[in-house]
Structures are given as C-alpha cells and as structure tokens.
Design a protein with these regions (language model features):
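Secretory targeting signatures
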Residues: 1-46
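Flexible loop/hinge segments at secondary-structure junctions
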Residues: 15-18, 36-374
Length: 374
C-alpha cells in the first residue's frame, strides 16, 4: 500500500509574514514597470503603438517599425496605416492613434489647441512622374509645370515644353494629369511649390492638402498615383521619390531657383535644407518650407515630413499607460538617431545634425502625468 510520508513539524516563519513579503515583491515589480525601470525587452511585456497619416514617408516608417522591433530587443510592435496627412491629423486630434505622420505642418492655432508637437523625422522629394514612352528625358521648369496642372498647357508638344527640351521629338498627345484624391501632404508640398513659382496658380488654387484640380484623374495615396501614372498613357503626376524609384517610374528633371536643372537625389534634397532655421517642437511650424530653395544643387520640391505627438501623453480619453509612453518616445528617439541610417536606401535624406538637435530637445520635453518621459 502507498505510504504516507509526513514531514516533521517545525516552527517557521508565520504565514502572514510570508504573504506580506509576496505582496511587497508584487508591488515593487509593478512599480518598476510603471516607472520604466524594466525595459520592454527585459520584461517580455508586449507594447503596441499605432500611427497613421502621410504616405510620403510610409516606406521609411514601416522599415523603422520592423528594424526597431528586430534590433533593439524591445517587445514593441508599431503599426502605421497611412491614409494621407489629412486623415492622420484628424486621427491624432481625435486621439485614435498614438502618433501621426504629416507633410503639412499644423497651423499654430491647431497645434496649440490640441497640445501637439512637430518632430521632423526625414527629408524627401516630390517628383513629377510621367508616362510618355517617346520622351527619353523630360525637363520642366516651375511655371511650365503650373501651366500643365492648370490645363493651360494640354499637349506634350506645346512650345513651352519644347523650348525646355531641345532635341526631343515631342508627341502631340493630350496630357492627362494624375492627382491625389485624398487630403494629402504630398499635395500640400506640390501645390506649395506651384504657388511659389506661379502667381496665377497661387491666386486661383493656392497651397493646400486638397486642391480643386481642373480636369484631372484622382487616386488615393502615393501608391495610387504611382500605379495610375504607370497604367495611364501620356499622363503626368506627382509622387514621393521613393515610390518612383521602387516602381521604376520616370520623373522629370526640374529647373531650380538658381536656374540649374537638377534631378531629385539625396544630395539635392539635403542641399535644399542647408541653413534652414527651425522653431521649437511646440512652436510655429506653419511657415517652415524648403521649397524652391536657393543653391545650384538644390532640388526645388524638397520637404521635411513630420511626426505629430502630444506634448502630454497622458489622457483620460486614451488607454496609453506610462510603459507605452516610454516605448513611444524611445522609438521616436531611435528614429531620429539610429533610424536615419535606413533612409538613404529608400531615397530619404538623413536629417542634418541641427535638426536632430531640435528633435532631441522636443523629445526630452514630452511628459506623462506632468513628468518628463525621458
């Protein structure tokens, strides 16, 4: 038969004392999570962050999301849904996402009302993509480009285009313009350039995330415009450089502010940002622009693109806890430092040191329940 084994009874530590020690340990560990003493990687605790907005930087943000998870050891999953700058701004203002991407800086009234700060995270170019197989290389200047999108120039063999492209045999086909159908930071950048170089465009259409383009085909997002240009003969449209390169879409060489024809490259985009003076993260960004920048090597449709986050991350309207707040700021810090090395392979220019310094100051000022996160 089975034998019952009993241990000798000894006087030991009272059970109430043991229970008290266990409770104390639990409290200490919980406090460590709450104060960030344990990193997400060390604890194994999963954190999920969500973003949405500009498609201009989306290839880079998606790359960052993967590399941050794979290289840092932090168990932080970041999803970014695109949707356009306008949609991203709406979602961050409604606190439906943790961060938003936008190529169009907010008006001071909006950033102040919502308590949002700007973090420029990369530099890019908007290029003029075209689908006209008979043209080997296309050169355009700003005024001619504005005339095309205002439909004052409607055929590829127009004298204004011919004058810029000596030696090219231009076809007589009608030009089909492809534009963004959604509220778009890329449209904000492109229309801003046209408004800078054409007083007629500025007076009739102006700069905006949405423009009432005449007789144009609309498509959603940079991916949508890219594919529509590729599949529409005799068309012209505007997309971010990364999309043109990834999809082998030809794009025009543009005449810049100083009269030089310049292709969109990392170097020409960086040149456009040389010497730019930026405000504080919670300052007025509404007038920040590097469009039509001076300099022989500057590409004329270059732009910063921004991440928007709340200066105070705690809110009764969201479920963000302190661990998530720390993860968000750590991710953004990584993006403007280690993350910059991933930009050039995707045709985004790395931030100048002076811009990184502005971002550092901004990130070091962000709080959770009144306490600085970093």
């Amino acid at each position: 038969s089975e034998r019952e084994i009993s241990m000798p009874h000894k006087r030991g530590t009272p059970w109430l004392v043991i229970l008290g020690v266990i409770v104390a340990v639990i409290i200490v560990v919980a406090a460590a999570f709450a104060t960030g003493l344990l990193s997400t990687g060390e604890s194994g605790r999963s954190v999920s962050l969500t973003g949405a907005g500009a498609t201009f930087p989306m290839p880079l943000i998606l790359k960052w999301s993967d590399e941050y998870y794979n290289t840092t050891g932090h168990n932080v999953r970041i999803s970014y849904g695109g949707g356009g700058s306008g949609a991203g701004i709406t979602q961050i203002e409604d606190r439906h996402v943790d961060f938003a991407g936008t190529d169009a800086p907010l008006a001071t009234s909006d950033s102040s009302a919502y308590g949002l700060v700007h973090i420029p995270e990369t530099l890019g170019a908007v290029v003029v993509a075209f689908n006209e197989p008979s043209i080997q290389s296309l050169r355009l200047d700003g005024p001619t480009l504005a005339e095309i999108f205002m439909k004052n120039i409607t055929s590829w063999d127009d004298p204004a285009i011919a004058a810029l492209n000596p030696g090219e045999v231009l076809p007589s086909f009608q030009i089909t313009t492809i534009v963004r159908s959604d509220s778009s930071g890329t449209t904000f950048v492109f229309s801003g350039y046209l408004a800078t170089v054409s007083s007629e465009f500025a007076a009739i259409y102006g700069q905006g995330k949405s423009v009432n383009w005449p007789d144009a085909i609309g498509a959603s997002g940079n991916p949508g415009v890219t594919q529509t240009v590729k599949t529409t003969a005799h068309s012209i449209g505007y997309i971010e450089l990364s999309y043109a390169m990834a999809n082998d879409v030809p794009h025009a060489i543009l005449k810049n502010h100083d009269g030089y024809f310049v292709n969109a490259t990392l170097e020409s985009v960086t040149s456009a940002a040389t010497g730019v003076v930026l405000p504080a993260g919670d300052g007025d960004w509404s007038h920040v622009s590097i469009l039509d920048a001076a300099g022989a090597e500057s590409y004329p449709i270059s732009s910063f693109t921004y991440i928007l986050v709340y200066k105070e991350l705690f809110s009764n309207d969201t479920k963000m806890n302190k661990t998530a707040a720390e993860a968000l700021i750590d991710f953004l810090w990584w993006c403007v430092h280690q993350g910059q090395s991933y930009g050039p392979t995707l045709y985004y220019a790395s931030l100048p040191a002076s811009v990184v310094s502005v971002d550092e100051t901004t990130l070091n000022s962000i709080t959770y329940q009144g306490q600085v996160v970093r």
